[in-house]
Amino acid sequence: MSEEAGEDAQRKAAEREAKKAEVRKRLEEAGNKKKAKKGFLTPERKKKLRKLLMVKAAEDLKRQQLLKEQERQKALADRTISLPNVDSIDDKGQLEKIYNDLWARLTQLEEEKYDINYVVSQTEAEINSLTIEVNDLRGKFVKPSLKKVSKYDNKFKKSGESKAGTKEDFRANLKIVKKDVMEAIVNVKKKDDKPDWSKKNKDAKAEDSAPAAVAPEAEPVAEEAEAEPEAEEEEGEEEEEE
């Protein structure tokens, strides 16, 4: 019985180990599949590749700059003439010859420059006309490049034109106020600005002068009363005459 129990235990242990090995193998296969899905360019490899590309681009740029500088120096050496030491030359004929040579060289270079500029302008005009034709065939419209103009430029131009011509009368736009109205406004302001004590004195003087002004008004009443009998007498005389 003990031998059978030992064999069962060994068999179970072997089965357990076999299952563990199978599970481990499955996990390894799954990990390998995930790694294979990521591809060759991992993030680390991408960083390294980017650095290498940047270094190579910088080296190429430096090489191109050196080549351009060498070509420039070579072109300048071919085009320029080595100038002689004029200070050490005393012969007038030799100096005139140097002057004539330099002048001829200058005129030649100016002619070449003019020819090159003419060719460039012609080619640019042809390119523009061809691009316009192509855009017309495609049905596209090329917007012209508009020049930005400041709003103050027009004002300055107008002011300059006005100064050059007739002078502007800025008072023409002002509101016209009559002289009488202005004097009335000034008088009202002066009256309002007077102190209170002057107003009190004026009120007292007005009260004193009020009775004196009433007294003379009684005389016309008496005169009217005297005039009424005279009118009646005249009417009576007219009746008698009739």
From Swiss-Prot:
Keywords, in A-Z order: Actin-binding, Muscle protein
Any single Gene Ontology cellular-component annotation: troponin complex
Tissues in which the protein is found: Expressed in body-wall musculature, with weak expression in late-stage embryos and strong expression during the larval and adult stages. Also expressed in vulval and anal muscles, and weakly expressed in pharyngeal muscle.
Bias kind Low complexity: ranges: 210-219
Biased composition (Acidic residues): 220-242
Disruption phenotype: Worms exhibit abnormal locomotion, unregulated contraction of the sarcomeres due to small portions of each myofibril shortening irregularly and independently from another causing rigid paralysis. This is due to poorly defined sarcomeric structure, with small islands of thin filaments interspersed within the overlap region of A bands and the H zone.
A Gene Ontology biological process term: sarcomere organization
Family annotation (Pfam families): Troponin (PF00992)
Region (Disordered): 1-41, 190-242
Compositional bias segments (type: Basic and acidic residues): 8-32, 190-208
GO molecular function list: actin binding; troponin C binding
Role this protein plays: Troponin I is the inhibitory subunit of troponin, the thin filament regulatory complex which confers calcium-sensitivity to muscle actomyosin ATPase activity.
Similarity-based family: Belongs to the troponin I family.
Protein name, UniProt field: Troponin I 2
Gene: unc-27
